[in-house]
Amino acid sequence: MVNRERMVEEFLQLVSIDSLSKKERQMADTLVQKLKAIGYEVIEDNAGEKIGGNTGNLICTVKGTKNVPAVMLAAHMDTVEPGVGKKPNIDGDYIKSDGTTVLGGDDASGVECILEALRVMKEKNLEHGDIQVVFTIAEEGGLFGAKNLDYSHIYARYGFVLDSDGTIGAIAVKAPSQNKIFVTVNGKASHAGMAPEKGISAIQIAAAAISRMKLGRIDFETTANIGIINGGRETNVICERVDIKAEARSRDKLKLEKQTAHMRECFEQAASEFGGSVDFKAESEYPSYNIPKNAPIIGILQKAAASADIELLLEETGGGSDTNIYNSKGIEAVDISVGMDKVHSVEERILIDDMVKAAEFLLAIIQNVA
């Protein structure tokens, strides 16, 4: 039922719009126009003001024609860098970037699937329950749009987030919590050539701590990483301060706590040995979610997959998304693949057939809500 040519044309338009995190104004204005052209009103919340962006989240409620639970269809408007001056091109069966920027299919492909589903529902007069469309800002780097969404407008029971790569039919039903970790290692400055004995190297403390740390893949549901290290002024000065940004993730709360405590202990022990000190702060970036196989939303997906002739793949992921936040707000939500590939790179691409198939799957989902 979806219009392939229309989807391709509109997707090319969407990914050509500059829409970096906190700078989604042009994308938001474009989507408001498109939703109004279909026949729906749009609310813009004040999330942008809260996070220092130039637009808020968009919320569009489509009243249903039958009495079934309301659903939320969600995608995010922002892209990662390099994302300015994107020039998409069709290369055979794929739409790709020109190799100098990301394509922006993360998450314009999700946005496009939602727009096309709404049009088809209207054109074909298909029955459906209430649909709440949510296009968020600043998903990349912190899920800030979803965290600051005005939930007073949201009453959907189920959420379908179109923001995942992989095979069409792949559904992320379990995702981790993440702790962002900020560490300051304090040493003592001294002349590196004339009085190194009087100094305490913060770099040496940090190196000792990290060398003892369990990092990377800890187990099947837990990971940890040291991402950013800054420190030092000159080669002839013993470094007195190092700032480190790290993270730990796990789909198990106790494992996340254990890994975070382990990283703290490594830093504190190393600082004690060398006579320095450490300031260690861990902040919860987002909570985990786990949708059981007998949850109502899984039943909806199973029926939709069968009607759309799609193999349903219930998967666990190591990444976070707006889906984590929606579940924490009481919305039973899953993350659905829309076929994006090689995301967050200049090699990003999407198979046109996959995007079309994802839109068809979304239509089937809407029609199978009961």
For each of these PLM feature ranges, what is it?
Residues 1-25, 284, 341-345:
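N-terminal capping segment at the start of a domain
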Residues 20-67:
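A non-catalytic alpha/beta surface segment that caps or lines the substrate-entry region
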Residues 28, 53-54, 61-135, 152, ...:
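Active-site metal-coordination/substrate-binding segment of hydrolases
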Residues 90-102, 184-190, 308-309, 340-344:
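Glycine/charged-rich beta-loop-alpha catalytic/anionic-binding loops adjacent to active sites
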Residues 101-176, 218, 223-224, 228, ...:
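Acidic/histidine-rich catalytic neighborhood of metal-dependent amide-processing enzymes
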Residues 202-370:
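Metal-dependent amide/peptide-bond hydrolase catalytic core
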